[in-house]
Amino acid sequence: MTNRKITIAEMIAQKLKVRGVQRMFGVPGGGSSLDLIDATAQHGIEFHLSKREDSAVMMAAVTAEMSGAPGVALTTKGPGTANAVNGVAYASLDRSSVVVFTDGFSPAIKKYVTHQVFDQKALLEPVTKAHGLLESDDPTLEFEELLDQASSPPFGPVHVELISAVARKEILIPEDHKLPKKDKTPNQLMVDEASVLLATANQPVIVVGLEARSLDIAKQIDSLINKLNCPSLVTYKAKGVIADDHPNYVGIFTGGKAEQSCVSQADLIILIGMDPVELILQPWPYNAPVLDISEVNHTPHYSTPNTGLYGPLVKSLEAIEGNAQLSKWVSEEIVMHKSDMITRLTFPVENDLNPQSIVELAQSAAVHNPRATVDAGAHMISATAFWKVSQPNDLLISNGLATMGFAVPAAVAAALEDPERGAIAFTGDGGFMMCASELALAAQTNANIVVIVFNDGALSLIDIKQKSRNLSRRGTTWPRPDFAKVAEGLGCQSWRVDTVEDYKVTLEKAFKVKGPALIDVVVDPQGYGEQLTSLRG
């Protein structure tokens, strides 16, 4: 034990640096957040001032998803914590390892103060894995345990409520404070059962989910697919785990209608890293046996797996691959199912400038292979179906929470994490209006992003549902703003287009910009309803 003393804020900075944290996001107040910003700066951790707290947590979460290190966000107490909730819910339901620091109120102050005071722990408790005050006898161990909880499957946020007095408190720190790591191995009985299912299946289908978003897992999945030669699908967040140009790739799995013609022919459905948080609100439609290979046993689940292998995915896949045999699928059938999926999701309105062409033309013009970030809304169907990717996290989306206001902050975070590739954000006008202010951070950091706004003057998905119930059109539309002017005011180069010719020319300009750019695309929403029905039923 060393006699050297450091503050708890300094200890936090040290531990974050050891875990690989390079940047954090937030909106500080006058308390512990200032101590954290100062302490982390001494360890080379950059602080980025977001414009909203929920965006800050989303940026931290996306950083975690891309880097593998915990994401870090901080807020002030009271309104800062309240504003952060949607971002914390994203980290929770989209399974991102995030540490959320909020300031707090000391017991002495709570005796007489009610201004901004509420139970912050209780507010965030439903969407956090753990809470800590770092007031125990060993705050270093307490913080290490919180970090481990955030980084243990299912990944998620932890809440550190830190008052100024605690942040500045001096402590003795051990020379080495490592926690033992648990090394899980697959249950042999379950491996044997899974092996029997694999060996006896003639027409298996693989469905890959968000837990599989790493290169080593993707490689192991590819090996299994090649052995089985079977149709393979991914959830939205797993897009890229199987490359779009892979001969066995069929398309997106949502739990809806579009994939049923393929999956209904399976005599074994193999779920790999598939967290049911990603599926739509419909009952499981398949009768085939289910083999669930996942980091954890998720409950409740849409299906009732016949066998489950729970633990590290690579080890589970290695344990069963030797029993995989060439299926009776023929390659032409798999190609047919992929073609059928594309036909179902093709935008049904013949207009040169439509959601599908907006996405496809953007990819043709993109010169640095940017990552795509996709907001919730009707445009996401075209964005996820027709933006082609080849690696995990090439496309970033909120699918557990499915929140709007995600694509722009996610693009900023992605560009900061990987400046060379940068990012392209596909967002509806409704979602963009929720987070447009983050373009100021993009301009401040000269983030390599291009934002494509689908400007249709409506909450199109809700508009579709309203019409389907034969209700009057109320509360779902607005006059179309000029988002190019908004972006210009926030420091970005921007254009507004309403023809495909102008869009093509503008894309070339946007991808040449050294910094953030935005294209406000006036688009006709007709066709979204038919496309949605084809996808979900």
Where are these regions (language model features)?
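Thiamine diphosphate
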Residues: 109-116, 301, 310, 381-537
